[in-house]
Every structure is written in structure tokens, then in C-alpha cells.
Swiss-Prot record:
Localization terms from the record: Host nucleus
Protein family: Belongs to the herpesviridae TRM2 protein family.
Function description: Component of the molecular motor that translocates viral genomic DNA in empty capsid during DNA packaging. Forms a tripartite terminase complex together with TRM1 and TRM3 in the host cytoplasm. Once the complex reaches the host nucleus, it interacts with the capsid portal vertex. This portal forms a ring in which genomic DNA is translocated into the capsid.
InterPro entries the record matches: Herpes_TT2 (IPR005208)
GO process annotations (BP): viral DNA genome packaging
Alphabetical UniProt keywords: Host nucleus, Viral genome packaging, Viral release from host cell
GO cellular component term of the entry, any: host cell nucleus
Record bears the keyword ATP-binding: no
Predominant location category: host cell
HAMAP family the UniProt entry points to: HSV_TRM2
Quaternary assembly: Associates with TRM1 and TRM3 to form the tripartite terminase complex.
Protein name: Tripartite terminase subunit 2
């Protein structure tokens, strides 16, 4: 019985993932990040308060701040490009 084809299966990850996460470590880190995002989404519906939920809420607020700063910077750059 040939068992070599048991390890041959199509990837469930999109091919573009190589650009974002070229190494196995980066892919695992990305998976961890996705799990945190899933937890954040779940946290929106619950009102449980514990040390872990406070930490997650603080991380979520930090991510929101970073994203808002990126958007703010993009708007400033777009306005400056119009003047050039």
C-alpha cells in the first residue's frame, strides 16, 4: 500500500498567503492573529469582565488606534499629493 499520496492534499490557504506569510512561523503567527480577531468579535456580544477580557479589550483599542492613525496619515498624504 502506497502511503505517499496521503500527504498530497490541496492547500486550504490561498496562494497569495506566501506574500503575507512566507515562512511557517509567519503562517502560525497569522493564524494566532486570526484567532484573536475571532475572540474580539465574540467579545463584542458578551459583557464578561475578567483580567483576560480587559487585556483583550485594551489590545483591541490599541489596534483601533493604529488603524485610525494609518487612515489619518493616508488622508494627509492624499491631500498633499493634490497640491503637488
Amino acid at each position: 500500500m502506497d502511503l505517499s499520496n496521503l500527504l498530497d492534499f490541496p492547500s486550504i490557504l490561498p496562494e497569495d498567503i506566501q506574500v503575507i506569510a512566507p515562512t511557517s512561523y509567519a503562517k502560525l503567527s497569522l493564524l494566532s492573529h486570526c484567532q484573536h480577531l475571532k475572540l474580539f468579535i465574540g467579545q463584542q456580544g458578551s459583557k464578561g469582565v475578567c483580567a483576560h477580557s480587559r487585556v483583550l479589550e485594551e489590545k483591541l483599542e490599541a489596534v483601533k488606534e493604529v488603524i485610525s492613525k494609518i487612515i489619518e496619515t493616508d488622508k494627509i498624504l492624499e491631500k498633499s499629493e493634490k497640491f503637488l
